[in-house]
Amino acid sequence: VKRSEVSINFGTRRKIKQADIDSLFYMASEKAKDSSVEVVSVNPISYIIDDGRVTLEPIGENALSITANLSIIYADKKFIEMFNTIVAGLDYSSVEYISEPLAQALFIIPKERREDLALLIDVGDLTSSISFVKGDGLYALTSFSRGGGFITNDLADAFDISINEADKLKRQIVLSVKGKQS
C-alpha cells in the first residue's frame, strides 16, 4: 500500500465530473507504475477542492482544481501472473484481485467513522494485520507473524495444558481498548 497525491487544474471554475475522478485515478496508477508490481486498486482517502474543503464526494462540486489523496494497492506481478495462468486453465475468462484488509474495513467500519483515521486489527491464527483506514482507502497497512495460534501455544506452555484446553481458555479472554464514547 502506498499513498499518492495527484491534482487537476481545470483552468476555469466548473463542476467536477466522474471523468475527472477517473483521470485522477489514472494519473495515480501511471505515477505508481513499477516493473515488479501491478496496481490492484486505487481508492480515495480524501479530495481537496481548491477552496480548501475536504470531501469524499466531490462530484458536482464547483471548483477550479481538485487534489486527490489516494491509496494505491499493489500485488507482486509474479503472483498475479501465476494466478491468471491457473484461472485461465480452469476456463475462467477473468479474475478480480482485491485487498482483503480494505474489503474488511469498508464492510465493517461505518463510512462516518472512516472520515477520520480508523483502525482495524485482524488477528489471524499465524499472522495479524493492522489497517489504518481513511475515507475509502487504506492509509497504511502492516502485518506481522504473531497470531492467535501463538497465544494458544503460549497458554498451553504456561499452564501445562493441552492445545484444545488452551484454545478454549483463549476464547474466554476478552481484550479491549476503551476509547472515547461519541
List each language-model region with its residue ranges.
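A short acidic Gly-Thr/Ser loop motif
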Residues: 120-127, 133-136, 145-149
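Residue-level detector of high-confidence beta-strand sites
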Residues: 141-143
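Generic structural marker for isolated residues within well-ordered, non-membrane alpha-helices
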Residues: 152
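Nucleotide/phosphate-binding catalytic cleft detector across ATP-hydrolyzing
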Residues: 1-118, 139, 162-164, 171-182
